[in-house]
């Protein structure tokens, strides 16, 4: 085979697509409390925007409760506002510099909406994996055209790229199925 084609680079990029999908899915609310639920929230602080985890500590004291301990007392209002406006349907209760956030039960309609969103994230992940595959295939065609690899080597490598893509998409489907199970669990 040729040193001109690096399949490990494609593996890294596809693993990146899987990790991105996992990160996106962590932001979806399930029935259980999770500190990662608040990760996407950004706060207007000190003249700029910053992630909530840079102005507060997030803990899970109970299965349906989040606790946000704000480090700077002057930031409590901004953190509370950002959580309310996040679109997650959360209403923090302020207690000094600590915000307690009870997680209400998800109704059936909201669960189905979250499953749809999870499937949209999965489709974005599959598209990203296919883009990586396309880049790999284009590179192989160029190497073949420039006579840097033989047609046989090109065919073998393109089969490896396709197999890698199939495995990546299967892994994404598994990740989404697990998340769907968590969301639909009552």
Swiss-Prot record:
- GO biological process assignments: cytoplasmic translational termination
**Using the chain's own numbering, where are the disulfide bonds?**
none
Q: Keywords assigned by UniProt?
A: Cytoplasm, Protein biosynthesis
For this UniProt entry, what's an example GO CC term?
Answer: cytosol
What's the chief localization of this chain?
A: cytoplasm
Q: Does Calcium appear among the keywords?
A: no
UniProt keyword Protein biosynthesis present: yes
Subcellular localization, as worded in the UniProt entry: Cytoplasm
**Protein task:** Responsible for the release of ribosomes from messenger RNA at the termination of protein biosynthesis. May increase the efficiency of translation by recycling ribosomes from one round of translation to another.
Q: What is this protein called?
A: Ribosome-recycling factor
Designated gene of the protein: frr
């Amino acid at each position: 085979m040729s040193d001109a084609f690096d399949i490990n680079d494609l593996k890294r990029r596809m693993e990146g697509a899987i990790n991105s999908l996992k990160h996106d899915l962590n932001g979806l609310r399930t029935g259980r409390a999770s500190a990662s639920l608040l990760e996407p929230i950004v706060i207007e602080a000190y003249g700029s925007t910053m992630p909530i985890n840079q102005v507060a500590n997030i803990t899970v004291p109970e299965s349906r409760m989040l606790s946000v301990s704000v480090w700077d007392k002057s930031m409590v209002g901004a953190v509370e506002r950002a959580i309310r406006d996040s679109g997650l349907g959360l209403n923090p209760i302020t207690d000094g510099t600590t915000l307690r956030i009870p997680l209400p039960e998800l109704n059936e309609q909201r669960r189905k909406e979250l499953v749809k969103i999870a499937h949209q994230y999965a489709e974005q992940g599959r598209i990203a994996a296919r883009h990586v595959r396309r880049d790999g295939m284009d590179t192989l065609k160029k190497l073949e055209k420039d006579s840097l690899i033989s047609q046989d080597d090109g065919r073998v490598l393109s089969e490896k790229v396709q197999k890698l893509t199939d495995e990546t998409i299967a892994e994404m489907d598994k990740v989404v199925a697990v998340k769907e199970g968590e969301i639909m669990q009552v």
